[in-house]
Amino acid sequence: MHWNIISKEQSSSSVSLPTLDSSEPCHIEVILRAIPEKGLQNNESTFKIDPYENTVLFRTNNPLHETTKETHSTFQFDKVFDANATQEDVQKFLVHPIINDVLNGYNGTVITYGPSFSGKSYSLIGSKESEGILPNICKTLFDTLEKNEETKGDSFSVSVLAFEIYMEKTYDLLVPLPERKPLKLHRSSSKMDLEIKDICPAHVGSYEDLRSYIQAVQNVGNRMACGDKTERSRSHLVFQLHVEQRNRKDDILKNSSLYLVDLHGAEKFDKRTESTLSQDALKKLNQSIEALKNTVRSLSMKERDSAYSAKGSHSSAYRESQLTEVLKDSLGGNRKTKVILTCFLSNVPTTLSTLEFGDSIRQINNKVTDNTTGLNLKKKMDLFIQDMKIKDDNYVAQINILKAEIDSLKSLHNKSLPEDDEKKMLENTKKENIKLKLQLDSITQLLSSSTNEDPNNRIDEEVSEILTKRCEQIAQLELSFDRQMNSNSKLQQELEYKKSKEEALESMNVRLLEQIQLQEREIQELLTTNAILKGELETHTKLTETRSERIKSLESSVKELSLNKSAIPSPRRGSMSSSSGNTMLHIEEGSEISNSPWSANTSSKPLVWGARKVSSSSIATTGSQESFVARPFKKGLNLHSIKVTSSTPKSPSSGS
């Protein structure tokens, strides 16, 4: 299997939408923890620590300290702890901000850096007397998650990874030692995500479940702190916590991961310090720290000088070592990184090198963004798009229907009375009316002028005919006008009917849309609930599998211990029930020993084989009379002694 150690694979029901770059620059925080000086009593210290200003002043008053630095150099860090600081002081400054970042969906990294035996493992992992940052973070994190689950109803799942990098090879610390094999690292070209093939994550549901895995890491840390060179004490230790939180109320999903990295000594190893290693092994041992220094140097130069293009150099530096491959996202990526420097103030070269490394890495800016997405967002977006398509199709169909009705009304109106013909008819009617008025006026004048004269029959007939024709034309025009008015009224009624029908359809569509929106909200709630339940089921399933594997491992260990215990020889007493020998006591009918009290109530049997083993030293084999004392049985007869001789046997004395 492949395991993504940079960002946990998100559930298929959630997806991040393409948005604007909301990342914020965040420089790598550097914390210095000084170890008490040795060998500089009654002399002015070379390094002056100011825990209030968080500065370290380097002074070269001693001429024996050869260095290329100036006489006075000041190093500024985010926090400086002097030699009087305790574990509680360091944890008070670090633990709660780290946990708040994890709970808010940010990725984080804590790295310890410094020379060997300067307190790196002690600060990160701790000891039996004083816990370090790692167990304190785990305990506080679970307390907060469980509290949020009780008060807010949030659900969560936690998984852990633990591996070490030794000689440019990665090993899983959560598998038994005989089964540990080198693992392969793989990083896709388009993403920052790093995958470790065949690594075994452990899913935990409480701090009690996590303690056994923390103990495995503590064992490695103690091995490194003690400098046990028979083991891989010169290895880099990486412990990862992945936290997934589901907020049902706000309908959001938060994914965050935390690296806790304990590096081996930052000094360069050679034959004087590692006499048992070959030159190739020493080269691989120094390769990871050198690659880390080169990467930090390249990135800090890029930050100091914007014109400096370090793209090629630091990209190649990432690939120089598996350590830098693992820490790639912590150096300039999407992580809030904190580096804890530990050093001996009495050792000027190593302390100065450590301070310079801290000054360089502090100039690197990471682009940090929270890993918060909508719960079940992909399915909701698919549902939303599907609903929008349905609504669009509904609106398009409604528009097409209305367009068709308008076209039909226009065609009916055009068929009943073309617009041009109607205008012409109205104009002709107006002209005829004007002519008729003029004719009536002329006729009226003629009649008025000829009232005293005798009317001309011919003129009267012509006038009468003209008036009759005009009256018929007027009647026809009025009839056509009435018909047109009736047609217009019918069209108006049809238009009003269509409008009322359209309003009814619109109101029906509104009601349907309201029903669709209601069903959509119900479906979204169901999808959210299903996603939460699915996530919880997956979490419990993984937790069950992890516990089952843990139980099998413990059963196997118990079985091996029982077999080893049974294989250890133990002193045996001379008794009839001893299993130290394979000699069987053969008793036959008629033999003299069968008449002894030891064989009471057994003489009726023709042949009896002893049901217990006796040691080879329990029965005398010499020719002279020798005896042995048999221990009493736990059950049956209590026989004190049996005497066996090569001559005529005598009855042994009865013990009871």
Swiss-Prot record:
Alphabetized GO MF terms: ATP binding; ATP hydrolysis activity; cytoskeletal motor activity; microtubule binding; plus-end-directed microtubule motor activity
Keyword Nucleotidyltransferase attached: no
Cellular component aspect of the GO annotation: cellular bud neck; cellular bud tip; cytoplasm; incipient cellular bud site; kinesin complex; mating projection tip; microtubule
Highest taxon of the lineage: Eukaryota
UniProt-listed SMART domains: KISc
All residue ranges annotated as the Kinesin motor domain in the record: 27-364
Binding site for ATP: G114, P115, S116, F117, S118, G119, K120, S121
Record-linked Gene3D superfamilies: Kinesin motor domain
Keyword terms: ATP-binding, Cytoplasm, Cytoskeleton, Microtubule, Motor protein, Nucleotide-binding, Phosphoprotein
Pfam families with a match to the protein in the record: Kinesin
Localisation per UniProt entry: Cytoplasm, Cytoskeleton
Modified residues annotated as Phosphothreonine in this record: T583
GO biological process: cytoskeleton-dependent intracellular transport; microtubule-based movement; vesicle docking involved in exocytosis
Miscellaneous notes: Present with 1920 molecules/cell in log phase SD medium.
Family: Belongs to the TRAFAC class myosin-kinesin ATPase superfamily. Kinesin family.
Entry function: Possible microtubule-based motor that can interact or substitute with myosin 2 (MYO2).
Protein name: Kinesin-related protein SMY1
Organism: Saccharomyces cerevisiae (strain ATCC 204508 / S288c)
Gene: SMY1
